[in-house]
Regions:
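C-terminal beta-signal and adjacent terminal beta-strands/loops
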Residues: 596, 638, 646-648, 704-708, ...
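C-terminal beta-barrel architecture of Gram-negative outer-membrane proteins
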Residues: 208-209, 676-736, 751, 756-760
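Short acidic/polar hinge/loop motifs at secondary-structure boundaries
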Residues: 113-141, 160
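Gram-negative outer-membrane beta-barrel transporters
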Residues: 483, 592-594, 614-710, 794-798
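Extracytoplasmic beta-strand/coil segments of soluble accessory domains associated
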Residues: 71-113, 135
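Structural signature of Gram-negative outer-membrane beta-barrels, strongest in the C-terminal barrel
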Residues: 429-431, 455-595, 631-633, 643, ...
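N-terminal periplasmic "start-of-domain" segments of outer-membrane beta-barrel proteins
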Residues: 31-65, 94
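Transmembrane beta-barrel wall of Gram-negative outer-membrane proteins
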Residues: 176-207, 212-251, 255-299, 342-352, ...
Length: 799
């Protein structure tokens, strides 16, 4: 790392004189316009009738020093929540917009889709410190304008790379904080060389011990870019690599071991009644009995000879690490993943009316989970075995590796025509995906099983290939009727073909394989229309937009007893008003999102922590989003936003497991129940202080109750929480060598709140001890918490 930073400094110094001379011959505004052309196809046009939040380069660059992943910055905008498995905001991280999870949020980088084509998620852990590479971000809530890649059912996030710098420069940064979290990185630009060339690069890495047990790890990213430009033309190649080896905790802080639940009223105290009172209702209760950092992927609750959970003298439950057969400790469950993006883009400012851009892209990804499986049934891996006496072996400890290899490649093109009252953008995106899913058993504690299946070192228990083709074409136009009025129209056609075959990682109880033979094609037409009126700082807008979305892989492979998945449709209606004055601004946005066959989270997880979903025939989300800010003094500003919503399923049939039998379910009908993971209120408040070189921000965030399934049962929910963070920066501007020196401190969760921001639930009807009514059944919750009070200090030097 020291060698890399030294090389940055040498390259920067050597290029200074020549680059400064050449930079003078270019108009920087024209260079910025060429970058704007690259993202014009996926961003809302000026005055477009959508709910939009823009994040500036300075905010992105400052946030990148925290080591946290980008969703935690996005969570400062209306209607967004974020959380991470390790409790610190680094590594494996997730987000929701308007209650819609990652797979329903379209994300692009310079117009190139970033969502993994099969599961439609973005793996933020593989985007460490990306904020330092970006020039801006635009978040569109709701359907928004047409974009490339998967359909937007919660929102669209358009990331734009920073404009190549005409002048040479460099930056190094170091951060250190709680739980031994260390973030470091640097970047450089040669400035303009030979009147046409710019070379730039960056490297960032975050190491941490993690708040949750067994979540230590490291993740990082690197970037290398070459730009060739003329006054109105630019070709740019970007190579962005990502790597991670991070400890996993997708089960969260689970209230129990396996089928034995610690939740109040669901614990078996030895009487076989499963109704003992433990006093555990939420994550705070788990923390108070010594289980606040408990991770079932790393350890298990200790039990006595009677099979009951053991406490110490202080009333805290004891845990014990997983062990291998030789007595050594299992290190931890890890996600090991490498990804490399290659983007070659060209943008051309043709004349006063026409601009165009095209990008070729290729992404390679490869990785696997390495996981200890305690006391698992053999049939889950397609195994059968007997001991020397011919007795069937039913369970053993295992280590498995579940992995995938991905190749994604395609082309993105768009052209923009502006003349008189017209602003027209047309374009297309064509993308192809090839992937392979695989799973190996690499260890078992049972000698008989090992001799039968692992004599060659490992045993492949599933293997599946996948192919996905995605092509979309769009045309969007804005017409200015008068100085105050504009109308908008947007049409998109999208074709998707998905095929997967091979055998899945699901086996019947007699160890028979689950063969996959899925071949689906979808054709979607997504029209949108709206208007905008603006005068003297006032703006009123409205729109109606349709979007469709195909099922993701898990909808086919982990569907349980629910019907075969269907594509979903959304009609999104937005109406808003904003006002901007010299010292204050305010805005309100109303929305109604009407879903047909919406994929709704069931509250269950796949066995690698993915949220499982199923189609719901009729559902809706409606709400109001408020934003306001005022600067009463030159050194003080106050801002806030609020997202208040109602998220309902009109009618819903729940499939409830009976007596833990895989093929026995009861169906329970609900009317007008609240959608899972959809809080009715998300509030953010900010107080910003800036005086000379000092900047300080107080940020308080409130999230209301979240139900973990779709039954609107308070027992199976996460209570509301409020958390406050404070950050302070001080900037020095030396006159020589170092352009800026920035010292920063981040204080997170300053009131040390104990809360979970996400989770999962399993519930069942157990007839052995009497039929539980729907509001009092057996249940177990996994809480995904954030850490209590933490802090991080950072230093940034800019040259």
């Amino acid at each position: 790392m020291k060698k890399n930073l030294l090389m940055m400094a040498v390259l920067t110094s050597a290029a200074v004189a020549n680059a400064q001379k050449n930079a003078a011959s270019y108009d920087s505004t024209k260079v910025e316009k060429l970058q704007e052309i690259v993202v014009s196809g996926v961003r809302a046009q000026k005055n477009a009738p959508y709910a939009v939040t823009n994040i500036k380069k300075s905010e992105l660059n400052e946030f990148s020093k925290t080591g946290q992943e980008l969703p935690f910055l996005f969570a400062q905008t209306p209607g967004v929540i974020a959380w991470s498995e390790n409790g610190l905001g680094t590594g494996t991280t997730y987000m929701r917009i308007r209650g819609a999870g990652d797979s329903r949020i379209n994300v692009t980088l310079d117009g190139v889709p970033l969502n993994s084509p099969e599961d439609q998620c973005v793996f933020w852990a593989n985007m460490n410190s990306y904020g330092s590479l970006l020039g801006s971000v635009q978040i569109q809530r709701g359907v928004g304008s047409s974009t490339n890649g998967d359909g937007a059912f919660g929102g669209t996030i358009a990331l734009s790379s920073a404009t190549p710098s005409l002048r040479p420069g460099g930056e190094v940064s170091f951060s250190y904080g709680s739980y031994n979290t260390f973030n470091f990185g640097g970047k450089f630009s040669t400035g303009l060389l030979g009147n046409h060339w710019i070379i730039d690069g960056a490297y960032h890495q975050t190491n941490t011990d993690g708040f949750i047990h067994g979540t230590s790890g490291r993740s990082g990213s690197y970037y290398g870019g070459v730009t060739w430009m003329k006054e109105n033309f630019q070709i740019r190649y970007k190579n962005i690599g990502n790597f991670e080896r991070t400890g996993q905790a997708w089960n969260g802080v689970t209230a129990g071991n396996g089928d034995y639940s610690l939740m109040d009223g669901s614990y078996d105290d030895g009487s076989w009644t499963y109704n003992a009172k433990t006093g555990i209702h939420g994550y705070k209760d788990m923390y108070n009995v010594g289980l606040g950092r408990y991770n079932t992927l790393y350890e298990k609750l200790a039990t006595g000879d009677d099979g009951l959970f053991v406490k110490d003298a202080n009333g805290n439950y004891l845990t014990e690490r997983y062990k291998m057969a030789d007595g050594s400790l299992w290190e931890k469950t890890t996600d090991n993943f490498w990804q490399n993006h290659n983007i070659l883009s060209a943008s051309w400012n043709i004349n006063d009316y026409w601009v165009a851009t095209a990008s070729l892209h290729y992404t390679y990804g490869h990785g696997y989970y390495d996981e200890f499986r305690y006391n698992n049934k053999l049939y889950k891996f397609g195994m059968t075995a007997t001991d020397d006496n011919g007795n069937n072996i039913k369970k053993s400890d295992f280590v498995r590796q579940k992995g995938l290899t991905q190749h994604t490649y395609g082309i993105v093109w768009n052209a923009n025509y502006k003349k008189d009252n017209w602003d027209v953008i047309g374009g297309f995106s064509i993308q192809n995906f090839d992937g392979n899913h695989f799973g190996y058993v690499t260890y078992t504690a049972n000698d008989f099983v090992r001799q039968k299946y692992l004599s060659n070192g490992d045993y492949k228990y599933y293997d599946s290939d996948a192919h996905k083709f995605d092509a979309s074409f769009y045309l969007k136009a804005a017409y200015q009727i008068s100085k105050q009025w504009e109308v908008f129209a947007d049409m998109q056609y999208r074709h998707v073909g998905y095929r997967t075959d091979g055998y899945n990682d699901r086996y019947t109880e007699d160890a028979q394989k689950h063969w996959l033979d899925i071949n689906k094609k979808y054709d979607f037409f997504n029209p949108k229309a709206g208007f905008s009126w603006h005068l003297d700082g006032h703006r009123v807008y409205g729109s109606a937009a349709m979007s469709h979305r195909e099922p993701e892989r898990n909808n086919f492979t982990d569907n349980g007893k629910y019907p075969a998945p269907e594509a979903e449709r959304l009609m999104d209606y937005e109406l808003g008003y904003t006002y901007t004055a010299s010292k204050w601004h305010a805005g309100v946005n109303l929305y109604y999102m009407d879903y047909k066959d919406q994929f709704v989270q069931t509250g269950l997880l796949s066995d690698i922590g993915e949220n499982l979903t199923t189609n719901i025939k009729d559902s809706y989300r409606m709400g109001i989003e408020l934003q306001a800010g005022v600067a009463p003094l030159e050194w003080l500003s106050i801002e806030g936003n609020a997202a208040l919503s109602k998220n309902k399923i009109k009618d819903f049939d729940e499939k409830v497991n009976v007596d833990w039998k895989d093929d026995v379910y009861e169906t329970i009908h609900y009317d007008n129940s609240t959608l899972a993971f959809s809080p009715s209120a998300i509030l953010n408040g900010f107080i910003n202080f800036h005086w000379r070189g000092i900047q300080a921000t107080w940020h308080t965030n409130f999230v209301s109750r979240q139900y973990l399934d779709n039954t609107e049962n308070k027992d199976r929910s996460l209570p509301s929480y409020s958390v406050t963070n404070v950050k302070v920066n001080y900037t020095l501007k030396p006159k020589k060598i170092i352009r800026e020196c920035i010292f920063g401190l981040n204080f997170n969760n300053i009131f040390n709140r104990r809360y979970a921001s996400s989770g999962w639930v399993y519930s069942a009807i157990l007839k052995d001890y009497g039929d539980h009514p729907n509001d009092n059944r057996y249940y177990q919750i996994g809480f995904i918490p954030m850490a209590g009070f933490t802090m991080m200090g950072n230093v940034t030097l800019r040259f």
